[in-house]
């Protein structure tokens, strides 16, 4: 055990020799001071080593008491005996210094165990008796200080144990506090996660509601356009019946132009609505995908415009040829169909009305299916867009463009089928009108 275990030290005492020469200093154990003995040097030692040394054999590493006691018969050999004792002590000190064993000269341990030193009791040495009494006093004070140091040591050990217990309690409290903080942080993190999920769900619901509103508006516009189309067809039908045969060509041409305009209007409306839905659902990806989307939209627009132009030219040529051929056929079969017109006129009107109604219903059904397909595709793409990375967005846009082209093709085919149906009905009406003309016009 270190010397610092016993608290602060005082200044070490010095020991003077008989001639006032060499001094013995005890820097490590301030209370281990001994009376001045001529030529004796004291080695430093701690109280624990003293106790251990006391429990060991008296003969190991110490001088016996009789080594320093003068014989009563040989008082004159006192100085020589002291010199021999000093030489032995010095030899033992030099030997025990290398072995780290404390050496107590003059047999102090044995003296403390037995309670007194056996000193020379010759009447000639009064100074020796005085030194013996002083030595006894020092030994008693040494024992008292040793006991006090042991008590201090026990007290310090108890304080250390109490401090260690307090440290363990504080450490446990600190760990509990950290665990509570970690639990609170985790709870806060979960709350933030739930809040974030709820906000994402609200945004998704808002997007779906906006899309449903757009779809309802598109349905209303589509119904109004279909209604307008029906009104225009009925008006054209009445005017075609009332007018002469040479007005049929102009009516067909005007109807064809109106159908093409309605087709273009529906395409533009569908394109605008889809663009608005895409803009609302891809606000977060607008910066990275805006340029690509604009390029694709421009290409799609140019392709659609070129396709519409080609289709208009082709349809114009086909309708012109069909009208010319039909006119020739009508002139050939005019005489044959004049007699059958009376019986088939009413039937033709019913068939035309049914055909128009069927065409309108088919148009509505196909429009609803196309809108549902577009909505389903848009919902699927919006859900994927919220989950997938930015690099997949380009592929989704390409797929959407292809789907849009397919829908445009379906719409175009549907319009062509309705136009074909209208032309067939108009052909029958023209044949009926030609059949009802008087013979003198012919």
UniProtKB/Swiss-Prot annotation:
InterPro entries (alphabetical): CCDC91 (IPR034592)
Alphabetically ordered keywords of this record: Coiled coil, Golgi apparatus, Membrane, Phosphoprotein, Protein transport, Transport
Disordered: annotated span: 1-27, 48-79
Gene Ontology cellular component annotations, sorted alphabetically: cytosol; membrane; trans-Golgi network
Topology in the lipid bilayer: Peripheral membrane protein
Region (GGA1-binding motif): 1-16
Compartment list: Membrane; Golgi apparatus, trans-Golgi network membrane; Golgi apparatus, trans-Golgi network
UniProt keyword Transport, yes or no: yes
UniProt modified residues of type Phosphoserine: 43, 46
Region of interest (Homodimerization), ranges: 211-414
Alphabetical GO biological process terms: Golgi to lysosome transport; protein transport
Coiled coil: 127-213, 248-409
Primary location group: membrane
The keyword Membrane is assigned to this record: yes
Biological function: Involved in the regulation of membrane traffic through the trans-Golgi network (TGN). Functions in close cooperation with the GGAs in the sorting of hydrolases to lysosomes.
Subunit structure: Homodimer. Interacts with GGA1, GGA2 and AP1G1.
Protein name in the entry: Coiled-coil domain-containing protein 91
């Amino acid at each position: 055990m270190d010397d610092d275990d016993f608290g602060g030290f005082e200044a070490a005492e010095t020991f003077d020799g008989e001639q006032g020469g060499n001094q013995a200093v005890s820097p490590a154990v301030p209370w281990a001071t001994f009376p001045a003995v001529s030529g004796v040097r004291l080695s430093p030692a701690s109280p624990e080593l003293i106790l251990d040394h006391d429990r060991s054999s008296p003969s190991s590493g110490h001088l016996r008491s009789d080594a320093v006691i003068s014989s009563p018969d040989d008082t004159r050999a006192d100085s020589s005996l002291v010199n021999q004792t000093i030489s032995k002590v010095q030899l033992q000190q030099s030997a025990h210094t290398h072995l780290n064993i404390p050496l107590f000269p003059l047999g102090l341990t044995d003296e403390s165990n037995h309670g007194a030193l056996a000193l020379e009791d010759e009447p000639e040495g009064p100074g020796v008796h005085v030194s013996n009494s002083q030595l006894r006093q020092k030994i008693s004070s040494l024992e008292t200080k040793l006991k006090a140091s042991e008590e201090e040591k026990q007290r310090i050990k108890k304080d250390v144990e109490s401090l260690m217990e307090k440290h363990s309690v504080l450490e446990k409290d600190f760990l509990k506090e950290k665990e509570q903080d970690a639990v609170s942080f985790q709870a806060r993190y979960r709350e933030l996660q739930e809040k974030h999920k709820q906000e994402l769900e609200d945004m998704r619901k808002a997007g779906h509601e906006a899309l449903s509103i757009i779809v309802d508006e598109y349905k209303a516009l589509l119904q109004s356009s279909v209604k307008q189309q029906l009104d225009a067809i009925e008006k054209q039908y009445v005017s075609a019946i009332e007018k002469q045969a040479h007005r049929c060509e102009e009516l067909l041409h005007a109807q064809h132009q109106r159908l093409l305009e309605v087709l273009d209007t529906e395409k533009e409306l569908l394109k605008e609505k889809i663009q608005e839905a895409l803009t609302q659902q891809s606000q977060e990806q607008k910066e990275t995908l805006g340029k690509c989307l604009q390029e694709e939209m421009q290409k799609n627009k140019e392709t659609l415009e070129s396709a519409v132009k080609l289709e208009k030219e082709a349809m114009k040529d086909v309708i012109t040829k069909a009208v010319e051929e039909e006119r020739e056929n009508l002139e050939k079969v005019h005489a044959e169909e004049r007699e059958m017109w009376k019986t088939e006129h009413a039937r033709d009107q019913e068939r035309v009305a049914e055909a128009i109604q069927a065409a309108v219903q088919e148009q509505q059904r196909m429009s609803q299916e196309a809108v549902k397909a577009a909505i389903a595709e848009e919902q699927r793409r919006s859900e994927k867009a919220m989950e997938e990375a930015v690099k997949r967005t380009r592929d989704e846009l390409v797929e959407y463009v292809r789907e849009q082209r397919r829908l445009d093709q379906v719409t175009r085919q549907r319009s062509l089928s309705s136009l074909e149906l209208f032309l067939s009905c108009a052909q029958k009406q023209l044949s009926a009108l030609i059949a009802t003309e008087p013979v003198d016009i012919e």
